[in-house]
């Protein structure tokens, strides 16, 4: 989730005022307290990524109500909030940008950029196993699920064939990283490694 103490943790770093800092939010409501905290250190973020409910991976919504939200509305809410508060911070639309037409619509509505990730999982440059790339390429809507098996405890969107599903993984995460079990293992990573071992012939 959004760590409200991020600026406090970084404020003593020599590059605190030089390096670009961006945050990811899923609502204007989540943005408000972060900006309030950041203003204390005279260091607002350089850009804001607004991630919608159709993003791959972790979601900033509840497991039961993510379908009630849409990226266009959230981006507009954030843009209105920034304008009302006279904050000139670039906004990046993410999570549900499927086509060039989508990208143009967001840019024309006021976003400074768009973020596209899942589309590139099937490219040659992507390091996923070839079998997994084919799963992405051939997936239809029914092959995509939202669940709470992530070690973070947050809802996440994944393919139904994910090796994490059915592996017995339970939420066990703290703010600063995954908790290891008594033997020093991370269940999430172990599930991934098992998948690699079972499908070595498909890894390029």
Where are these regions (language model features)?
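Active-site entrance/lid segments in N-terminal catalytic domains of soluble metabolic enzymes
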Residues: 1-85
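Conserved active-site-proximal phosphate/metal-binding subdomains
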Residues: 45, 55-75, 79-90, 98-204
């Amino acid at each position: 989730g959004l760590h409200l103490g991020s600026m406090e943790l970084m404020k003593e770093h020599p590059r605190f005022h030089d390096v670009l800092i961006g945050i990811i939010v899923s609502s204007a409501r989540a943005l408000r307290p972060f900006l309030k905290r950041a203003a204390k250190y005279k260091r607002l973020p350089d850009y804001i990524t607004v991630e919608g409910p159709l993003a791959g991976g972790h979601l900033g919504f509840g497991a039961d109500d993510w379908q009630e939200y849409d990226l266009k509305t959230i981006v507009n809410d954030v843009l209105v909030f920034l304008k009302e508060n006279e904050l000139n911070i670039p906004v990046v639309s993410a999570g549900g940008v499927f086509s060039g037409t989508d990208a143009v619509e967001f840019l024309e509505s006021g976003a400074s950029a768009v973020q596209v990730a899942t589309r590139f999982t099937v490219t040659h440059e992507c390091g996923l196993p070839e079998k997994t790339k084919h799963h992405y390429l051939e997936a239809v809507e029914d092959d995509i699920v939202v669940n709470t098996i992530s070690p973070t405890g947050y809802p996440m969107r994944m393919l139904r064939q994910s090796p994490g599903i059915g592996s017995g993984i339970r939420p066990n995460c703290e703010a600063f990283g995954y908790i290891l079990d008594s033997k020093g293992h991370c269940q999430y990573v172990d599930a991934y490694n098992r998948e690699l071992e079972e499908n070595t012939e498909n890894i390029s």
